[in-house]
A protein has these predicted regions:
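N-terminal beta1-alpha1 cap of cysteine-dependent amidohydrolase-like domains
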Residues: 1-74, 78-91, 201-251
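Hydrophobic/aromatic beta-strand patches that form the interior of the parallel beta-sheet core
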Residues: 15, 40-42, 61, 94, ...
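Surface-exposed, flexible loop/turn segments at secondary-structure boundaries
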Residues: 22, 47, 68, 101, ...
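Short glycine-/acidic-enriched loop or helix-start segments at secondary-structure transitions
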Residues: 25-27, 51, 71-73, 104-106, ...
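Short, glycine/charged-enriched secondary-structure capping and boundary segments
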Residues: 29-31, 57, 74-77, 108-111, ...
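Cysteine-nucleophile active-site neighborhood
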Residues: 57-58, 62-132
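Pocket-forming structural segment of enzyme catalytic cores
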Residues: 107-188
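C-terminal helical/coil "lid" or tail adjacent to the Rossmann-like core of SAM-dependent
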Residues: 174-176, 180, 184-212
Length: 251
């Protein structure tokens, strides 16, 4: 799917923040478009601005990237600071991998590598907490590509965990979520990542390239189903968006 021409002016927009020149929102973007949303793709790393308010957008997603949330680059600090906009307005926000780590930094938490320098690159187990189980069913394994993780910041609910990096999915307030794994991954993206990122598969804890594709064959159906359930919970559709403030008032 070509997202570059997706500028529907009469459809609710979801802000998409990417970090590389040729990055794609992948399956997440595809599913949002199927739900009737237009994608407003911005890349602050290359000079794009971010909105002062979320009133013009139905939600926002900050995706991953090869950089660290601890990097000194101006765009990294800009994005971390900007996340307070959807958090304060309680607008739907999703951080994926780096995006989740940026949200944690905004909340005063820390991002760091594993004490034994282990990475997660490939498919790894995921276990929902009781809070996570109350929300939805979760896949048993998910696709990962990271060498840093985040702690649990004050005010965040832990939804899912794993043995190597214990904080895998969190919720902050009624509408903000951060996930360490990559449900957006398409087959084409896996080919690209495992080709360009081949040296990273030599890092401790990483899986070999063939295991990535074997894992996708086994686990991707469950990940796809999870993403559909998550989007139902998080944003809904353009015609029937989730009213998080109403849900909060009913709790």
């Amino acid at each position: 799917m070509d997202f570059s021409s997706n500028h529907g002016t009469h459809r609710p927009k979801v802000l998409i923040v990417l970090h590389q020149e040729h990055s794609s929102p992948g399956r997440v973007g595809q599913e949002l478009v199927k739900r009737g949303f237009a994608l407003d793709i911005r890349k602050p790393r290359f000079g794009d601005s971010l909105p002062d308010t979320m009133r013009g957008h139905a939600g926002s997603v900050i995706f991953g990237g090869p950089m660290s949330a601890n990097d000194p680059d101006g765009f990294v600090h800009k994005e971390i600071d900007w996340i307070k906009v959807p958090l304060q307005e309680e607008a739907p926000f999703l951080g994926i991998c780096l995006g989740a780590q940026m949200m944690v930094k905004q909340l005063g938490g820390t991002v760091s590598g594993h004490r034994d320098e282990l990475v997660e690159i490939g498919y790894y187990p995921l276990k929902p907490t009781e809070a996570g189980k109350d929300l939805m069913d979760w896949p048993k394994k998910v696709y990962q590509w990271h060498r840093e993780g985040f702690d649990l910041p004050s005010g965040a609910d832990l939804l899912a965990t794993s043995p190597t990096y214990p904080n895998q999915a969190i919720r902050v307030g009624p509408a903000a979520y951060g996930i360490q794994f990559h449900p957006e991954l398409t087959h084409q993206m896996m080919v690209k990542w495992t080709t360009k990122g081949a040296p990273r598969m030599e890092l401790p804890g990483a899986q070999q390239r063939r295991d990535h594709f074997a894992g996708r064959f086994v686990y991707d159906t469950a990940v796809r189903a999870w993403l559909d359930r998550f989007l139902d919970l998080w944003i809904g559709t353009a015609e029937a968006p989730v009213q998080h403030n109403r849900l909060k008032a009913a709790e």
